[in-house]
């Protein structure tokens, strides 16, 4: 194995599955392709790439995400162009989702925001990506 493996899927633990399904449906303008429940595990799944949110019946009450703890810092969704990245602030505004400004760094440009469980999300355009629409 000489190359870094591709990511297969992302799964985030949320406090309220139904509330999160509704939030991500509005964000992506797409319903999940599957909602499942098995024992204490409940999940909703979107494909391309595979993205899931899940809630366990035995969660810590009142817990919220904090990227300063060991574990996940944030999840970034890729943008194919600068035009696509620049379209997201208006979309987030229309949804009433607070966000920062697009930040240009040496490794790429990103727009950070948070879901209702305080999980930091980002739309990201790596350096070397298309700058055209």
Per-range role (PLM):
Residues 1-21, 72-77, 129-133:
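N-terminal beta-strand motif that seeds the catalytic metal site of vicinal oxygen chelate
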Residues 2, 11-52:
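Core segments of cupin and vicinal oxygen chelate
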Residues 2-3, 89-133:
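Vicinal oxygen chelate
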Residues 19-21, 82-87:
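Short, conserved charged micro-motifs
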Residues 42-45, 73, 109-111:
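Short beta-strand micro-motifs in enzyme catalytic cores
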Residues 48, 69-72:
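Short connector loops at helix/strand junctions that flank enzyme active sites
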Residues 59-65:
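Short beta-strand/turn micro-motifs at beta-sheet edges
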């Amino acid at each position: 194995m000489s190359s870094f493996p591709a990511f297969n899927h992302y799964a985030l633990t949320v406090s309220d599955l139904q509330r999160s399904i509704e939030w991500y449906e509005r964000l992506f303008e797409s319903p999940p392709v599957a909602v499942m429940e098995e024992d204490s595990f409940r999940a909703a799944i979107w494909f391309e790439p595979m993205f899931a949110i899940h809630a366990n019946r035995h969660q810590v009450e009142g817990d919220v995400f904090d990227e300063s703890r060991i574990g996940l810092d944030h999840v970034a969704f890729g943008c194919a162009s600068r035009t696509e990245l620049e379209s997201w602030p208006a979309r987030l505004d229309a949804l009433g989702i607070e966000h920062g400004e697009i930040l240009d760094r040496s490794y790429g440009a990103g727009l950070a925001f948070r879901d209702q469980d305080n999980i930091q999300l980002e739309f990201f355009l790596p350096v070397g990506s298309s700058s055209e629409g």
